């Protein structure tokens, strides 16, 4: 689900252990005395981060994560410590709970932030995923184009200077800023002084975190390619990146009070003015958009309430003890998951950051990797990350609102993109992506032939109709051409090693084998 970056401290198994069951390595780095001992390595990390020009806020956030790693903090959330959420505000109630009024004054105090640091490496891309074309049509708009067009349309419709920011990475900044300058230069024009030659700030950069050597908990070294010594710190870095870059203070100085934050690859995540009014009218410090879990969401995380103080908490799969697995998977008990569409009150955020030395106390997500991800023979390291949705537990009076599934349409795989490019989705005159099907069709493509974007593109001459299809599974190397319509639950299986074309036609609840015997 959105917000799940990886296992929570897999270095300690991601599960509960008694002291007697700790391994030698875990024992070496657990307990108060060992914590002091292992934290002796901290000055090396601080020196390394300062030499790279990272902010005090970024360093403080990493130090908090490193301290948890050294303490053996597994992040387990026991069922006995939480309560299921019985009722939340619905999307319809939120949209009708405020007085009808002009949205322009609120929009002038709002900024749209898109997390845009991903390269889409899981799809074989070496450029920003947001530069992928959404529809195979004449417009050829990318994710970033639609985001920019949505902002421009909202400014025009409401006569308001809605702010727009990308949280880029060092890997995506150059390409995406070049694209904006070439195709959407008006977004970089100053909002307050049209005569100024300075560009309007539309980006801030995510930080980077040093990888931790597994065996010693020292800073990891990779002499042949020092860039492998660093990793993205997860989207929980939003908060120290905003604070440490000065962007948070600049927004507040400019009169901006509200943020709407979402992933750039979630085409369902558009700024809804009624949700903005609901958020502002109730003076919530933080609001999360959630969806109802279905059977396909059983393994994904859910939100709940902490029994001790009633605050919302995110619990991911790796934070669940084995004994609680049945409770975790019970979607009638734990009903909601995080979409990663978040609303943040900047004044409350700044207060929380300053209270915690520039870094919110977020649960640690610890990924075990090879220092060179392309070489399994290289030493093991820990990558320390956090998730931005976990910040919901940092605020009193935080809120969650149940939104329709149409506001959660992420593109993580080529199957997701295949679905989005079909007629199950359309693009409106306001450049929003609209679900035309009753429910999003599930698309499972053979990873041997479709996992990489270029491979999928080479096998699709025309995307099939999926508007009345609930599930499509493709096995083998199948070429899709014009005139193919799927309905209900369908599968296509190429039984040979050679590419096989699927003939045009309508297929309803069909299990198709290629080559056809007829």
Q: Predicted segment positions?
A:
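Left-handed beta-helix
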Residues: 4-108, 277-518
């Amino acid at each position: 689900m959105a917000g799940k970056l990886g296992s929570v401290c897999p270095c300690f198994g991601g599960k509960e252990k008694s002291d007697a069951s700790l391994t030698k390595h875990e024992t070496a780095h657990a307990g108060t005395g060992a914590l002091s001992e292992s934290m002796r390595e901290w000055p090396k990390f601080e020196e390394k981060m300062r030499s790279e020009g990272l902010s005090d806020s970024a360093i403080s956030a990493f130090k908090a994560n490193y301290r948890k790693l050294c303490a053996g903090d597994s992040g387990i959330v026991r069922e006995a410590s939480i309560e299921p959420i019985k009722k939340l505000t619905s999307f319809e109630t939120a949209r009708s709970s405020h007085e009808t009024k002009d949205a322009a004054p609120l929009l002038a105090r709002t900024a749209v932030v898109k997390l845009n640091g991903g390269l889409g490496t899981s799809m074989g891309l070496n450029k920003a995923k947001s530069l992928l074309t959404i529809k195979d049509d004449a417009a050829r708009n990318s994710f970033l184009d639609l985001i920019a067009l949505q902002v421009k349309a909202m400014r025009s419709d409401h006569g308001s200077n809605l702010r727009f920011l990308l949280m880029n990475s060092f890997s995506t900044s150059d390409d995406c800023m070049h694209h904006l300058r070439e195709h959407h230069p008006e977004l970089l024009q100053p909002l307050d002084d049209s005569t100024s030659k300075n560009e309007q700030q539309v980006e801030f950069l995510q930080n980077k975190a040093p990888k931790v050597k597994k065996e010693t908990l020292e800073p990891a070294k990779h002499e042949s390619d020092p860039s492998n010594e660093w990793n993205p710190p997860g989207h929980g870095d939003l908060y120290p990146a905003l604070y440490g870059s000065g962007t948070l203070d600049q927004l507040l100085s400019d009169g901006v009070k509200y943020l709407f934050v979402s992933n750039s690859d979630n085409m369902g995540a558009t700024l809804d003015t009624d949700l903005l009014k609901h958020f502002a009218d109730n003076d919530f410090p933080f609001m999360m958009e959630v969806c109802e879990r279905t059977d396909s969401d059983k393994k994904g995380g859910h939100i709940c309430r902490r029994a001790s103080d009633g605050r919302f908490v995110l619990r991911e799969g790796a934070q669940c003890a084995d004994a609680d697995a049945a409770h975790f998977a019970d979607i009638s008990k734990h009903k909601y998951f995080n979409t990663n569409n978040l609303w943040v009150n900047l004044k409350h955020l700044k207060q929380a950051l300053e209270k915690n030395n520039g870094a919110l106390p977020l649960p640690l997500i610890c990924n075990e990797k090879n220092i060179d991800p392309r070489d399994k023979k290289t030493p093991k390291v820990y990558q320390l990350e956090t998730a931005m949705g976990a910040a919901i537990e940092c605020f009193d009076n935080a809120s969650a609102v149940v939104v329709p599934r149409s506001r959660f349409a992420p593109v993580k795989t080529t199957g997701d993109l295949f679905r989005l490019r079909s007629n199950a989705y359309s693009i409106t005159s306001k450049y929003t992506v609209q679900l035309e099907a009753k429910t999003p069709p599930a698309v499972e493509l053979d990873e041997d032939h479709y996992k990489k974007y270029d491979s999928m593109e080479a096998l699709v001459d025309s995307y099939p109709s999926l508007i009345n299809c609930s599930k499509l599974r493709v096995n083998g190397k199948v070429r899709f051409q014009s005139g193919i319509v799927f309905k209900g639950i369908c599968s296509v299986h190429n039984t040979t090693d050679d590419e096989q074309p699927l003939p045009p036609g309508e297929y309803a609840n069909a299990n198709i084998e290629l080559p056809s015997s007829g």
